[in-house]
């Protein structure tokens, strides 16, 4: 099992090493989870986002670890992508602001179990971000 684990670890390290740094003009993404919860520098989610080729609004606003964004901050900074969690039927006050009608025009992607732990599955999350970045670039011509 050790050899198999080493091979998986090497493959993951190789995949991550072959990703380029995020360009200054890369799409801007905002983590906007229930209650405005946002993730900044020093989090796995931020690392996934950057490895996928997007900038993180929370980091540009100086967030270290986690914090909160207001609806007004999100609208003011006009991120290219909103990243939220899956919503479920019913009503939750914590989800009220992330369902606000003013956010309807923003492309939205949802985190999944691939974002949770630093396992080789994070490559799936990175690939999801990269696909969204590519889709935005195709649409805008950048």
Language-model regions, residue ranges each:
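N-terminal ligand-binding lobe of clamshell/alpha-beta domains
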Residues: 1-142
């Amino acid at each position: 099992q050790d050899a198999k684990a080493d091979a998986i670890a090497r493959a993951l390290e190789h995949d991550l090493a072959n990703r380029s740094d995020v360009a200054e003009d890369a799409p801007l993404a905002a983590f906007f989870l229930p209650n405005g919860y946002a993730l900044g520098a020093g989090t796995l989610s931020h690392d996934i986002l950057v490895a996928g080729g997007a900038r993180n609004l929370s980091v540009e606003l100086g967030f270290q670890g986690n914090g909160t964004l207001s609806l007004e901050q999100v609208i003011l900074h006009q991120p290219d992508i909103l990243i939220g969690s899956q919503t479920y039927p019913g009503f939750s006050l914590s989800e009220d602001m992330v369902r606000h009608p003013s956010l309807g025009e923003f492309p939205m992607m949802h985190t999944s179990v691939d974002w949770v732990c630093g396992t080789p599955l994070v490559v799936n999350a990175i690939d999801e971000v990269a696909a969204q970045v590519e889709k935005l670039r195709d649409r805008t011509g950048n």
